[in-house]
């Protein structure tokens, strides 16, 4: 018989998979000899497209059974036969525990049958799931609910005489609206719909300006209260990467103000003039950070000049750019290629002044995401790594680095600088505007676009990697044992190993 005589709604839905041949519902299997308890049969390999789930036993469970086909099987003779798979699928499901004489269980990832009591000659095999499979299919929870309400479906109101058809109906065959069977109706939790986050890029700047202008007085009072609280130690601070997601215009501005107030814990108290100046510079989300006046002391070290920018000051906007004081002529961004003059100034700083090196970190009044990733939170000093130890690193603990050079670069051919800050930082950190994400570790070059870096790697370094891999593969083939395929570093080790096979 064909599969098309069933309604389409019964076998196309994933929860109502009644995908079986009609003959299987009206067949029964009887044994021709006595079978003791504990006898196993199988495996029942579900390789057919109509039998791709272990739920086929439950789908054949009904209160009324019509026997149109009777198969008499000798299980002992069928154990080693390839027909063991078809006749196991013909075994009908038991209606209750009293009728059950065989249970289905998993062994080695396959379905097996096992007798739970002595089966006499001519008796029909009736199977149901063991405790493990009943728990996996969710029958335990439905059974606990059925002890109080009886065998009546809470969805469609259909009543059953036996337990197993009721469980199969509630779990797979009920076509009504699905309700939580385990929990009563009056205790069911209402459905909570999640609101999708909508990022409004058009009104970020306008809403941020309006909100921060109205909440300037509130920020001032909160800042005064938090000045009296003890500051966190560097050990208790966590360096985390924060991502801005704007849900709506109102929630965007609210979250922005909360972020700004939260980052004030990391800043040190400054005078009122610096606070007012930083608030004015943060009114717009797309304004540049103003250049600070030249220091009065001409002999001040370049580390004191770069310290506020190494601390990564910015406003609360994700679109603002930082203008490093070491490169005054042009603006720097994480996606722009730095000029040679700015990079030369960053890599060749003047000797620092150790007396004033700690005072350079006091200018931290401006707030932003980059303030969390400031150099005072890392155990490695950023500016001190450019000169290979020539500059002092007062915040370095024990002289150890978290980001070792060999974890970020792979020296093939020429030797790279191991003390460069580009090899000591993760790809998400961009000191002095140098684009680490679009940086070639082999040539020490930075690219403005990621596509340029990809084109550079394919055109300049593809042959080198291919040649190296080919040489390594040939060497491994020569130093590999042809019998046990064990690899050796030296050829005389392989020669000594080959004597063991003789």
From Swiss-Prot:
Please provide, in alphabetical order, the Gene Ontology terms of the cellular component aspect for this entry: nucleus
* SET domain sequence ranges: 8-130
Zinc-finger keyword on record: yes
Q: Which UniProt keywords apply?
A: DNA-binding, Metal-binding, Methyltransferase, Neurogenesis, Nucleus, Repeat, Repressor, Transcription, Transcription regulation, Transferase, Zinc, Zinc-finger
The listed locations are: Nucleus
Q: Which PANTHER family match?
A: AGAP007109-PA (PTHR16516), ZINC FINGER PROTEIN 488 (PTHR16516:SF5)
Q: What is this protein called?
A: Zinc finger protein 488
The gene from which this protein is expressed is znf488
